[in-house]
Design a protein with these regions (language model features):
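A short aromatic-anchored loop/beta-hairpin motif
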Residues: 16-140, 145-201
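Short, Lys/Arg-enriched N-terminal segments with co-localized hydrophobic residues
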Residues: 2-16
């Protein structure tokens, strides 16, 4: 009975909580999961069934050019885009690529997440990344982060994450090593003020 009551309570909170799509989840310093230590996760989808997001500050030892080679997409190694680092977007389906990019007309395979951010898994879009047809700004992740129904809400109640509206400048313009600090600073306080008991925004 206790477990069912807990699940029902979490489900009710899911219905009451606004969608966190186009928000950042900022890992608290107390985060125990090594994958999400100091992680900034961009939430792409959040509804009553669960949530899906991409970590934007966990680089891996793979470049865009190397990734395109692995999936047999011709690319121009002389282009700066080919040298851009790929990120680990999460522990789920780590062989699957996701592209967050700035809006570009004609990208019918991309889904608009906000006025500044689109997402795609299309190989057609990947094939443009080292060409003149590429979006102005983009990042690629391998894998994604997923939460089942009520799981993210419970983690928020457990103070595992801070929440803030996403800023595309942090995704596309901020150096990787500064993204967590910059996201925290958007909340209006210093990193040193964070503690396991700080709660979520």
């Amino acid at each position: 009975m206790g477990l069912c009551h807990t699940q029902d309570s979490i489900t009710k909170r899911v219905k009451l909580m606004q969608s966190l799509e186009n928000h950042f989840l900022i890992a608290m310093p107390s985060m125990q999961d090594p994958f999400f230590k100091r992680a900034v996760t961009y939430i792409c989808e959040h509804n009553e069934e669960g949530a899906m997001g991409l970590v934007i500050n966990q680089p891996i030892d793979v470049t865009v050019g190397e990734l395109l080679d692995k999936i047999d997409i011709d690319n121009d190694k002389s282009q700066h885009a080919a040298q851009v680092t790929v990120f680990a977007g999460g522990p789920v389906k780590t062989d699957r690529g996701f592209v967050l990019h700035s809006p570009k007309p004609g990208y019918s395979a991309s889904q608009k997440l906000s006025s500044d951010i689109m997402i795609t898994t299309s190989k057609d879009v990947l094939a443009t990344l080292t060409t003149a047809k590429a979006p102005e700004q983009f990042i690629i992740t391998l894998g994604y982060s997923g939460w089942e129904q009520g799981q993210l809400e419970q983690e928020l109640l457990d103070n595992s994450w801070l929440i803030i509206k996403a800023d595309p400048k942090i995704i596309f313009d901020t150096p990787v090593e500064k993204r967590w600090e910059m996201a925290v600073s958007m909340l209006g306080f210093d990193i040193g003020q964070l503690s396991p008991e700080a709660g979520h925004a």
